């Protein structure tokens, strides 16, 4: 089971400049097993692209399934965001930096409930979710 991140789905559904690479990566992943979206990704894609039912139908048409975030993943996300805030403070950076809870929920879901994550945000997920297989669409 491989999870897919919002940025890649926006490329696919919005026909963005990375759409071809994202499509090739998704096809490869689907060839080896299920590809899933978690609650956060479904919410973010809906917010970015339109009506929920239409978005979920489009995801279903692409062969993606829904995988809700489990309690253990939610707890891990909170722990990782706490580390992020502590690192930012220690480095003298503003705590209100771009990383919000949704990023940590997506990462924890992929780490604990899946076998990898398709994303364009390689650095963040490798840094905070050690052991997570990060799959980046090649452009």
Where are these regions (language model features)?
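Acidic, PIN/NYN-like endoribonuclease modules and their adjacent C-terminal/linker elements
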Residues: 1, 107-139
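Short, well-structured N-terminal submotif of metal-dependent ribonuclease cores
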Residues: 1-37, 46-61, 129
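A generic structural signal for short hydrophobic patches within well-formed alpha-helices
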Residues: 9-10, 42, 74, 125
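Short beta->alpha linker loops
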Residues: 40, 50, 69-72
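Short, hinge-like loop/turn segments at secondary-structure boundaries
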Residues: 52-56, 84-86, 134-138
């Amino acid at each position: 089971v491989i999870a897919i991140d919002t940025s890649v789905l926006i490329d696919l559904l919005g026909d963005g400049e990375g759409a071809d690479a994202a499509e090739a990566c998704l096809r490869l992943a689907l060839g080896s097993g299920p590809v899933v979206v978690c609650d956060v990704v479904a919410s973010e894609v809906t917010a970015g692209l339109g009506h929920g039912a239409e978005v979920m139908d489009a995801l279903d048409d692409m062969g993606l399934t829904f995988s809700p975030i489990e309690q253990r993943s939610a707890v891990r996300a909170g722990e990782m965001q706490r580390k992020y805030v502590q690192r930012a403070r220690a480095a003298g950076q503003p705590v209100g930096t771009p990383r919000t809870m949704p990023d940590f929920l997506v990462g924890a879901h992929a780490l604990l409930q899946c076998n990898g994550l398709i994303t364009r945000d390689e650095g963040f997920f490798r840094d905070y979710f050690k052991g997570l297989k990060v799959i980046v669409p090649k452009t």
